[in-house]
Design a protein with these regions (language model features):
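PLP-dependent amino-acid enzyme catalytic core
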Residues: 1-246
Length: 246
């Protein structure tokens, strides 16, 4: 099945001292395949969901795509609550996988989460809860972190810093937990949009870097983060294009 191919993504050399984990090769196209599969697997094992379950989640897109894909694979009904300003490609993919898309105002992740919670309360839907479940952190601690260490040992390189764009905070905190035990000197760096610098102490705002900067720090424990970097939407686009060319 498709979800059997989640994880074990390539370690790509970008420069002499910089490597990237290529999460885009996951079946759903993003790192969000990992926590979605992990949460579904754990929920099935605990008997919290079955073939008659309807699963709902608030998302900026990637988690929704992963959930819609795996929902189609496993036979679940999927409902996705998403701000209306997310890309049309994401909306199309969700619908192609058979998910029902419910849109809220642009950039309104608080509203998306509130509506998701209301559907859980009123309809009895099962919430994935990517923004709050410790399973999100556990997933990256048990899988992504171990893969990073394994890759570094294979190429004979020591890791001095880990940098991640931050949405729910699951990736960042899972990797941080791993390095706190394995090599505490590794620097943990979070990246967020300049237009919505919530972790930096600023106000949330609209931005164009879909997938990070969802308006709150959510799972992020700032005491465990060594540095926070902000980047503008325009600069992020320029750098992404440069990376693709090189």
């Amino acid at each position: 099945i498709v979800s059997d191919f989640v994880g074990n993504t390539p370690f790509v050399k970008l420069s002499e001292k910089l490597y990237a984990k290529l999460e885009s090769v996951n079946p759903g196209g993003s790192i969000k395949d990992r926590p979605v599969k992990w949460i579904l697997d754990k929920s099935e094992q605990m008997g919290l969901i079955n073939k008659n379950s309807t699963i709902v989640e608030a998302t900026s897109g990637n988690t929704g795509i992963s959930l819609a894909m795996m929902g189609a694979e496993r036979g679940y009904k999927i409902k996705i609550v998403m701000p209306c300003d997310m890309s049309e490609e994401r909306k199309t993919l969700l619908k192609m996988y058979g998910a029902e898309l419910i849109e809220v105002d642009e950039g309104d992740f608080d509203g998306a989460i509130a509506l998701k919670d209301k559907l859980v309360h009123d309809k009895g839907y099962f919430p994935l809860n990517q923004f709050s479940t410790p399973l999100n952190i556990e997933c990256h601690y048990k899988t992504t972190f171990k893969e990073i260490v394994s890759h570094s040992l294979k190429i004979g390189k020591s890791i001095t810093a880990f940098i991640a764009g931050t949405g729910t905070g699951g990736t960042l905190m899972g990797i941080q937990k791993g390095f706190s035990e394995y090599e505490p000197r590794v620097k943990i760096v979070a990246v967020e949009p300049l237009e919505s610098p919530v972790m930096s102490g600023g106000e949330k705002g609209l931005h164009g870097i879909q997938g990070i900067g969802d308006g709150s720090k959510f799972l992020v424990d700032l005491k465990k983060v060594d540095e926070i970097i902000t980047i503008s939407t325009e600069d992020a686009k320029i750098r992404a294009k440069e990376l693709c060319k090189n």
